[in-house]
């Protein structure tokens, strides 16, 4: 049911996506069941680590199969869409940092019900000491996706190049990696206790 919900939500049915999501939830569900059954012959650390592998596969599948990128030139008050989000370029401001000057874009992100979700503020920075230009990405994250915005070159007359990235399930890559690490710590602690009992 959860797998079907994910496909309906992202509106994509690629073979790689199907295999990845089914495999991920098979690993996750099996290890959750085993963990609650508390089988004495199985290490809790190993079960937790395997659970992390399932979460990792979930994140990698989502971020590689359903990612979307949009590159567009926008002027202030222009709007664009990516997936279910409407993005409005509200304003551009000059700001001064401790060792840089920057142009900061202010973008409002709305959902399909016209509720504001977040404000993204990507920057285009100039460091006079090193004579370097850099871009500062603005990110909004939740459990279903990451939304990135990058402000490129431009001016008030022609507008600015804006890069928008929609990356689903990215946070589950990090949660999966941390869960694998936690499983390793649990196994290490369990092995140390066994050694102490034997000594």
Regions found by a protein language model. Give the residues of each.
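Contiguous transmembrane helix-bundle modules in multi-pass membrane proteins
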Residues: 1-82, 87, 172-199
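Juxtamembrane/start-of-transmembrane alpha-helix segments at the extracytoplasmic/lumenal side
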Residues: 161-175
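Residue-level detector of functional hotspots within protein domains
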Residues: 39, 46, 66, 93, ...
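Soluble non-transmembrane domains of integral membrane proteins
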Residues: 70-160
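Short beta-turn/strand-loop junction motif enriched in small, turn-promoting residues
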Residues: 61, 92-95, 167
């Amino acid at each position: 049911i959860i797998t079907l919900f994910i496909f309906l939500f992202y509106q994509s049915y690629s073979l790689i996506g199907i295999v990845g999501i089914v495999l991920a939830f098979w690993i996750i569900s099996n290890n959750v069941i085993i963990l609650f059954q508390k089988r004495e012959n199985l290490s809790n650390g190993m079960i937790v680590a395997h659970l992390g592998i399932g979460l990792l596969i979930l994140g990698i599948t989502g971020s590689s199969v359903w990612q979307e990128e949009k590159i567009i030139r926008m002027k202030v008050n222009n709007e664009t869409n990516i997936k279910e989000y409407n993005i409005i370029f509200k304003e551009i401001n000059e700001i001064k940092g401790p060792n840089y000057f920057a142009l900061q874009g202010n973008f409002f992100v709305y959902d399909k019900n016209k509720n504001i979700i977040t404000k993204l503020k990507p920057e285009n920075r100039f460091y006079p000491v090193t004579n370097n230009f850099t871009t500062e990405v603005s990110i909004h994250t939740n459990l279903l996706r990451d939304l990135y915005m990058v402000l490129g070159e431009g001016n008030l007359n022609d507008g600015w190049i804006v890069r928008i990235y929609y990356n689903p399930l990215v946070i589950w890559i990090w949660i999966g990696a941390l869960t694998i690490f936690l499983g390793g710590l649990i196994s290490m602690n369990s092995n140390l206790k066994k050694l102490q009992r034997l000594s």
